[in-house]
């Protein structure tokens, strides 16, 4: 047993989609979350800068004595997850492999779409993982750089959001039966994405799939929080506006949360 919290990092609020799933599947675990909204989105940034920013988030979580770190950010996973995983002596999980595996299990036609930030798509990491696991799969990748700013500005339900999603996804419509939401911000746009793609296209939430791996590793390393420890103290940190973070989180998480501003 290990009552230390699980650390989550993201470029902003998108990783809350992963935290929500953790709270649903593993409600006894405690969360510490850091979202770097002040420097979001990470996707258009150079790899070197993404690496620097991500290490700052990792080091922040380490000061909080976490027992595991979850990269709730596809861009950071694509750029620096392997490096961090090799250097730390606690488990470090990313969202890309779980999402890739789920897409392969879901598809019937073998036609899979990937949407993500420019850096995630440029890295080809989803395509590589999918083809490593199942070489016969046909993968279509599409960068959607306008999606993260919509979410970070809390305009998910606006007419502008609907227009941008429709225009962005049109190259994939009618060509795939499975679509990986390759950015943890994107599930916040899920209803619009589903409407554009149609009811027959299965949407894969890579962050939600990651939580299943968290559960496996907690069991494997005997890191589960004691079920007799009833008091949970979830802590959330943002590098930008606390009010904006709370507003988005209130629509997404099943409880009121404590949020603090932090400067990295």
Curated annotation (Swiss-Prot):
Keywords: Cell shape, Cell wall biogenesis/degradation, Isomerase, Peptidoglycan synthesis. It catalyses: L-glutamate = D-glutamate. Substrate binds at residues 10-11, 42-43, 74-75, 184-185. The keyword Isomerase applies. Disulfide bonds: none annotated. It comes from the Bacteria. This is Glutamate racemase.
């Amino acid at each position: 047993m290990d009552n230390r919290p699980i650390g989550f990092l993201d470029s902003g609020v998108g990783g809350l989609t992963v935290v929500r799933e953790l709270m649903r599947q593993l409600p006894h675990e405690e969360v510490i979350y850091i979202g770097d909204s002040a420097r979001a989105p990470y996707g258009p940034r150079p790899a070197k800068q993404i690496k620097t920013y991500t290490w700052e988030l990792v080091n922040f979580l380490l000061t909080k004595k976490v027992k595991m770190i979850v990269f709730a950010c596809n861009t950071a996973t694509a750029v620096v997850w392997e490096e961090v995983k090799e250097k730390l002596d606690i488990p470090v999980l990313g969202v890309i492999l779980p999402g890739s595996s789920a897409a392969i299990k879901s598809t019937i036609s073998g036609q899979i779409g990937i949407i993500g930030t420019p850096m995630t798509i440029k890295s080809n990491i989803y395509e590589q993982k999918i083809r490593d696991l199942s070489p016969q799969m046909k993968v279509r990748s599409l960068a959607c750089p306008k999606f993260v700013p919509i979410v970070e500005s809390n305009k998910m339900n606006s007419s502008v959001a609907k227009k941008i999603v429709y225009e962005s996804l049109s190259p994939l419509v009618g060509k795939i039966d499975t679509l990986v939401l390759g950015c943890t911000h994107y599930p916040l746009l899920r209803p619009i994405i589903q409407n554009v793609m149609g009811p027959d296209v299965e949407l894969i939430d890579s962050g939600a799939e990651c939580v299943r791996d968290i559960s496996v590793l907690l069991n494997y390393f005997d890191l589960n929080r004691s079920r007799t420890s009833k008091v949970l103290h979830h802590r959330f940190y943002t590098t930008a506006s606390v009010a904006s973070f709370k507003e988005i989180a209130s629509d997404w998480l099943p409880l009121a949360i404590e949020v603090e501003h932090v400067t990295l």
